[in-house]
Amino acid sequence: MNLRNNKLHSSFIQRKAIKVISGINNFNVGQIFKIIHACEISKATYVDVARNPKIVSFIKSISSIPVCVSSIDPRALYESVLAGADLVEIGNFDCFYTNGVYLSNDQIIAIVKQVKYLLPYTDICVTIPHILKLHEQIYLAQKLESLGINLLQTEGSITNFSNEKLLEAKKINDNILYSTSMACCALSSVYSISKVVSLPVIASSGINGISASVALSYGASGIGIRSSVSKLGNIIDMSNYIDEMIFSTSKKLYDIDQNNLLYMATSNLSLNKCSII
């Protein structure tokens, strides 16, 4: 793994990368400004924004934080890099699912080849669709690695099984069960994909301060967060939430033993220290 941006490279090598996603369809400059400011305060690794050159130029004019642009349109990604984007992502497919648009492995690979042709010197991340069966996700991840992709990102969804677990967790007020159930699809993808590729894998979709540590123990090199930040009303609350995620990735709170059982590494928990902003 060799990313061109030194900050990104260092964070992924240390497996502490935090990506804050403003939303692939979020063109609200006021809200994006709040997210950028919160990222700067908390020192998030980078931000993921809509593929709009004007938004990219605006962010680069007010901040030094690395900018990722997400789209499935190669031309839009190319124009965003010309505007200053540091890396691009083919993904964040959630908004397409609601419109009944589902990309196959072959379609994703075709888009990747076009983007690599247009942007041979730009770091590229690809999201692995959660709608694919796990063995299909693994195949796609291996194929993308062979094509020279730099980063992979997982997705997740709420299945019938996880929804039952969520209801159970709410009933008994079990935050750990609730958090891992919210993220179970993304976590299973992280665990499976990270075993077969040497690329950094970003865990996204349903990840919070509890499940972030689980994701790292499962092989993730970074965490992607979106709705939990964007739904907050002010910069301080956004910054506090990002701080929580950074703490979760800075301490190995969970680990996997030789029998592949998850346990809490309580020796690494600090109960006497907190940060106040």
Swiss-Prot record:
UniProt gene name: ycf23
Localization, UniProt: Plastid, Chloroplast
UniProtKB keywords: Chloroplast, Plastid
Protein name: Uncharacterized protein ycf23
Family label: Belongs to the ycf23 family.
Keyword Nucleotide-binding: no
Keyword Cell cycle part of the UniProt annotation: no
GO cellular component: chloroplast
InterPro entries on file: Uncharacterised_Ycf23 (IPR007570)
